[in-house]
Amino acid sequence: MILVTGGTGFLGAHLVYQLSQKQDAVRVLYRSADRFEQVRQVFSFYTDQVEALFQRIEWVQGDITDIYRLNEIMQGVDVVYHVAGLINFEWRQLDRLKKTNIEGTANIVNAALAHNIKKLCYVSSIAAMSTSPQDSDLEESLEPIGVF
């Protein structure tokens, strides 16, 4: 079975559709059902059988910051695509961003290790890069330690 976190996001929904076309069962971890309509819209770009496809997928509610729930959800999973994450450029959201994007990702990795997951694919975005002007230029010296 394949588990996708963040399957109700833009990229995640496209990934869920593509994975659902394979023969493996797909389980999607979602935080809130209010994004299901957006997932249906993405599926409608690919097929007229949106509801049939939607029903074939196992949708499980949870949060990547809840390690106990993750351990339940990882049961029977072989492959994890970790697409979940928050994007926000406001400093007042920094604690929430860290909790989800850092602690949540650590929880995914630890749960995957605990359940002997065969493959973990982590997806990030350009939002992981800083937009701070002082970080825009980087100067480094390259000092190779050998010819290889």
What are these regions (language model features)?
Residues 25, 94, 100-148:
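Conserved Rossmann-fold NAD(P)-dependent oxidoreductase catalytic core, especially the SDR/UDP-sugar
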Residues 30-52:
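Glycine-rich phosphate-binding loop and adjoining beta1-alpha1-beta2 segment
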